[in-house]
Regions:
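PLP-dependent amino-acid enzyme catalytic core
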Residues: 1-452
Length: 452
């Protein structure tokens, strides 16, 4: 299996090289050269546990890693999850399920991909006898999950940019209280979009990337999206057979990577009926899927901070398929978008995609309603998924974070403050963070001084 850039101006790579590279040298994002058809394999995959299913799925793409080695990497990636199902599918009512994706070490769905990515990096460092420096930007959960995927690993250093004062206190503590010498929490003055823009400019500096063997953990990394395909497949296989063909996955998302993974799985032959994109008040994706226009707005802080995003980095992968896999067209559109901050899609399948937008008042109301009706405590991001469910479909709401990560919001909504032992332990640890300006030069200078 080879992987190509959405912009078509760089050679195709094998899996390990595409993962290590992160962002393609031409500024594009890697995708499989061909999309495999899994439809004939679905019956064979039924009944597999999560790690075994992930091994079988990743084996289709990671063809340059021996099967036994890949199996060990995958198995090790899910040993720190606290629920034996890894991704339990909870029925709440007839035709309504919650897929819990927060039983990993940082209590967020990002652990599914980033525990695996950390082990893939460790394998590459050992196999190639090289060090690697990892750079990422986060609006909340990605940074903590990336750090806990690489914490203390020999031959690695990880640098995570996040908007100072715009992540929850617990999210910041998960990044800045590790005490690990290879972890650097970089609090930048600006928004997540500012951090992501600076990150892309740093990666565009080919000399700097090469000198420091720089790689990415953001959802621009191919391995992230592929790993996230697995929990859609796992949930689909655990639904009653009569419900599978009518399932709509409801996905709280700001960066589009989570829903993109499900859509890619659908393109691999898994019969998923549709996807509902659930946004908070930062609603660029809601506007895209209701009007066809993708236009950047101003980021507004919300009760669901991990979705406080206006530039979705995985937009380019969706664009590549929507524009008929035409790299020249992708280059032209991305240049136009960079210049104007807007793009209008000529068409997309509105029967597959729908969207909802939830403001802070509604988030609090939905948390209370879901708790009252179903006895279920949803975090603020998951709450966005419960708005305007389609009664004609089987709804699977992706629960993307533990409610314990947002105690103030939950307490205000239902009068009970959720807790988790791993989060309580963080409160006594010192915060070690580095405040930086959100400029490529400042970030490069810091990495120069700390890289392995």
């Amino acid at each position: 299996m080879r992987f190509i850039s959405t912009r078509g101006e760089t050679p195709a790579l094998g899996f390990s090289d595409a993962v290590a590279t992160g962002l393609a040298p031409d500024g594009g994002l890697y995708l499989p050269e061909r999309m495999p058809d899994l439809s004939d394999d679905l019956r064979r995959l039924e009944g597999l546990d999560y790690a075994s299913l992930c091994s079988e799925f990743m084996r289709v793409f990671a063809t340059d890693i021996p099967a036994d080695t890949l199996r060990r990497i995958v198995t090790a990636s899910y040993t720190r999850f606290t629920d034996p199902a890894i991704a339990p599918l909870r029925p709440l009512a007839k035709g309504l399920y919650v897929l819990e994706l927060w039983h990993g070490p940082t209590l967020a769905f990002k652990d599914f991909a980033l525990q695996l990515l950390g082990n893939l990096y460790a394998h590459q460092c050992a196999a190639r006898r090289e060090s690697i420096n990892v750079l990422g930007a986060t609006s909340g959960d990605t940074g903590a999950a990336a750090i806990h995927g690489l914490i203390g690993r020999p031959g690695t250093a990880i640098f995570i940019l996040y908007p100072d004062g715009r992540v929850s206190p617990l999210q910041e503590r998960q990044m800045a209280c590790t005490g690990a010498e290879n972890v650097f929490a970089l609090a930048i003055d600006g928004t997540f979009d500012d951090a992501q823009t600076a990150l892309k400019e740093v990666f565009a500096d080919q000399g700097f990337r090469t000198r420091h063997r720089l790689s990415a953990v953001n959802s621009i990394n191919l391995a992230r999206v592929l790993a996230q395909c697995v929990y859609y497949l796992y949930a689909w296989l655990r639904l009653p057979e009569l419900e599978r063909g009518n399932v709509e996955f409801v996905v709280p998302t700001g960066n589009f990577g989570n829903v993109l993974a499900g859509w890619m799985l659908q393109r691999m032959g898994v019969p998923i009926r549709g996807f509902r994109v659930a946004t908070n008040q930062n609603d660029i994706l809601f506007r895209l899927f209701t009007t066809g226009e993708y236009r950047v707005g101003e980021v507004r802080p919300s009760l669901a901070p991990s979705m406080d995003i206006q530039v979705a980095s995985n937009f380019e992968r969706f664009l590549y398929f929507s524009e008929g896999r035409d790299p020249a067209r992708v280059r032209a559109v991305m240049a136009e978008f960079k210049r104007t901050g807007a793009y209008r899609f000529p068409s997309f399948d509105r029967d597959i995609f729908s969207a909802s937008r939830t403001d802070d008042r509604e988030i609090a109301e939905i948390i209370a309603r879901v708790h009252r009706q179903h006895g279920y405590v949803a975090d603020p991001h998951t709450a966005c998924g419960f708005k305007d469910l389609n009664p004609e479909r089987v709804n699977v709401v992706l629960s993307t974070a533990s409610p314990a990560k947002f105690p103030d919001t939950i307490r205000a909504a239902i009068g009970v403050e959720p807790t988790h032992p791993s989060l309580e332990a963080l409160k006594s640890r010192p915060i070690v963070k580095h405040r930086l300006h959100a400029t490529p030069d400042t970030i490069r200078a810091f990495i120069d001084s700390r890289a392995v």
